[in-house]
Amino acid sequence: AFINAQKFQPNVVIIKLGTNDSKPENWKYKDEFETDLEYMITTFQKCGSKPKIIICRCIPASNNLYGIRNEVITDEINPIQKNVARKFHLKLVDLYSPLEHKVDSTCYVWDNVHLNKNGSLILAEHIYKAITGKKAPKLRDPFAK
């Protein structure tokens, strides 16, 4: 997927990584997380399309079956993302705070990791604003009758 994204020559690149990295079996490679993120950024910066690159903080996760650890997200991953965004002078989109107190059925599906329609809408509104600099238009539910 990473190679295909480069070949696509994007105008905008949204990097939202880290949630699955917080699992114990993945976070044992935590020393590589920052350098891998920086590699992705520098690789996209070399694209002929000169894309706008946006880094996103991880969304919160609550008790879940997958081993995703919110304390790793808040104490380690999100600070790394913030530092890397600052180092490369990139926009950092905070997706954590808008969902921090909504890790329940209002914004998440039953597993407390994946977003439902409401949570996805919040995420989309914040990313839209990061790309355009404007407030997202009121979106209509395509499945509503």
Enumerate the predicted regions with their spans.
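Glycine-rich phosphate-binding loop signature in dinucleotide/nucleotide-binding domains
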Residues: 5-9, 47-48, 134
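N-terminal-biased segments
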Residues: 26-45, 142
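Generic alpha-helical hydrophobic packing signal
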Residues: 30-34, 38, 56, 85, ...
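Active-site segments of SGNH/GDSL-like serine hydrolases
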Residues: 16-20, 43-76
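Alpha-helical scaffolding within the catalytic cores
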Residues: 1-8, 34-43, 75-79
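Structural recognition of the beta-strand scaffold that forms the well-ordered cores
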Residues: 11-17, 52-57, 91-94, 114
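Catalytic His-Asp segment of secreted/periplasmic serine-dependent ester chemistry enzymes
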Residues: 59-145
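Oxyanion-hole/transition-state-stabilizing segment in secreted/luminal serine hydrolases
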Residues: 1-34, 61
